[in-house]
Design a protein with these regions (language model features):
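Alpha-helical recognition segments enriched in aromatics with Gly/Pro capping
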Residues: 1, 37, 59-267
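N-terminal, positively charged nucleic-acid-binding surface of large information/translation enzymes
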Residues: 1-46, 393-400
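Surface-exposed helix-capping loop/turn segments at secondary-structure junctions
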Residues: 42-49, 74-75, 160, 265-274
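Short alpha-helical functional segments enriched in proximate histidine and acidic residues
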Residues: 39-42, 64-67, 71, 75, ...
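Short, glycine/charge-rich beta-strand/loop segments that flank catalytic centers
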Residues: 4-11, 33-36, 46-61, 79-86
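Hydrophobic face of alpha-helices
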Residues: 26-29, 33, 150, 281, ...
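Structural preference for alpha-helix termini/caps and helix-kink/transition segments
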Residues: 206, 213-403
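Aromatic- and histidine-enriched alpha-helix N-cap/loop-to-helix transition segments
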Residues: 56, 144-148, 292, 296-299
Length: 403
């Protein structure tokens, strides 16, 4: 798979932040890109095959726009802007099922007098004083957001791409506009498949700066392993919204500690066993072919590791064959790539400070829950709180957190 990550490193928001901070737009964008790349590295996210920046594709963008003008799909305005003629593309709305007029909902339309129609969108924006700009056949200016993505994609992949990803909030108008631009120019289907991920909520509320509930990846990685974050995020369908609750990441970490413990035991018990179990591949492939059903793939892990525990107790080397295959296959999701001993040592250091009394109460409460003695369980939860600890339950265990 050739995977490209697009950086639209010149747009209205970057220019606005440049004016607010006094940092030149190109330097501000470079600083943000460096921050993104650094936190992705810390989260053990694989690098893309291609890193695409709009500012490194200005020539491609200008050529793309000129092609649209030549084909009758775009027009230059007297003020130096260039607009896409939405009426020239009858298939507009094919992805979202929405109309061109919908793009005007709640939007302040600028330069109406320069457009044929209010819903036409900018491909090139004439330079304003103090803005970053490039020379073009229509005067100095900069590209619009939508054309940046279309032109970069075409430069990297040609006229068609297999899979295009992005947030659900980008379906309209951004991805709709990408389709219109690209298919108007080439006459070919732009993308074969679209994978739109859901939005992030925190305790049921949309995550936003205004609500003060924003979570930064760097801050989460100070508390949890990258495996735990991936496990939590992959536990639901990517198309659905994900609700980050107080117990989401602690529960994921608790599962991973159990899994890594069994991997560590299997590797120490059978150091020379290199075989694998093909059934894991079959089930994993079936899950991925079901619209990247990572939730199903992760749910299989509980059964696999239950079997590993049973086999270890029976001193059966098949335990190692299963963990070998789990590590190889689930590495495709970024999981189980860490050294088990190092992972457990890091987590163990956090657990080492938990007093014996607290651990004993937690174990007693866990036993009460298994016996469905809910009154006793609630009583012991309150006792843990009085000792300074919160307990986060999961299907297979619990995790303790200092209050």
């Amino acid at each position: 798979v050739t995977y490209a990550r697009n950086y639209t490193d010149v747009d209205d928001k970057i220019i606005a932040r440049s004016h607010e901070t006094g940092i030149p737009a190109d330097k501000y964008a470079a600083m943000m890109i460096d921050k993104i790349n650094a936190v992705m590295k810390r989260a053990d996210v694989d690098d893309p095959t291609l890193w695409l920046k709009a500012t490194e594709n200005i020539g491609n963008i200008i050529s793309f726009i000129q092609g649209l003008i030549d084909g009758g799909h775009a027009y230059p305005a007297a003020n130096g802007d260039v607009y896409f003629d939405v009426d020239s593309f009858p298939a507009y709305g094919q992805l979202s099922g929405r109309s061109k007029e919908d793009s005007l909902d709640g939007v302040r339309v600028e330069n109406d007098e320069e457009k044929k129609n209010a819903y036409d969108f900018a491909l090139w924006k004439a330079a304003k004083p103090g803005e970053i700009a490039w020379d073009s056949p229509w005067g100095r200016g900069r590209p619009g957001w939508h054309i940046e993505c279309s032109a970069m994609n075409r430069a990297a992949f040609g006229d068609q791409i297999d899979i295009h990803g992005g947030g659900r909030d980008l379906v309209f108008p951004h991805h709709e506009n990408e389709i219109a631009q690209s298919e108007a120019l080439t006459g070919k289907r732009f993308a074969k498949y679209w994978t739109h991920n859901g939005l992030i909520k925190v305790n049921g509320q949309k995550m936003s700066k205004s609500l003060g509930n924003s979570l930064l990846l760097d801050d989460l990685l100070d508390k949890y392993s990258s495996d735990a974050l991936k496990f939590a995020l992959l536990s639901g369908n990517y198309r659905n919204d994900i609700n980050i609750t107080d117990d989401l990441f602690p529960s994921a970490e608790a599962h991973l500690v159990r899994f890594y413990t069994l991997i560590d035991r299997a590797e120490k018990a059978f150091p020379n066993e290199t075989g694998k179990e093909a059934e894991i591949d079959r089930r994993f492939d079936a899950a991925m072919e079901d619209d990247f059903n990572t939730a199903l793939a992760l749910s299989d892990l509980f059964g696999y590791f239950k079997e590993v525990a049973r086999l270890l107790d029976a001193n059966d080397p098949k335990a190692r064959r299963i963990t070998n295959h789990i590590r190889e296959t689930y590495a495709l999701l970024g999981l189980f790539k860490k050294d088990p001993a190092k992972y457990l040592a890091a987590y163990g250091e956090k657990e080492a400070d938990v007093p014996a009394e607290v651990k004993a109460v937690a174990e007693e409460r866990f036993a009460a829950r298994k016996a469905k003695d809910w009154a006793k369980s609630d009583e012991l939860r309150e006792k843990l709180k009085s000792l300074g600890y919160a307990v986060k339950d999961s299907k297979d265990g619990y995790a303790l957190e200092k209050i």
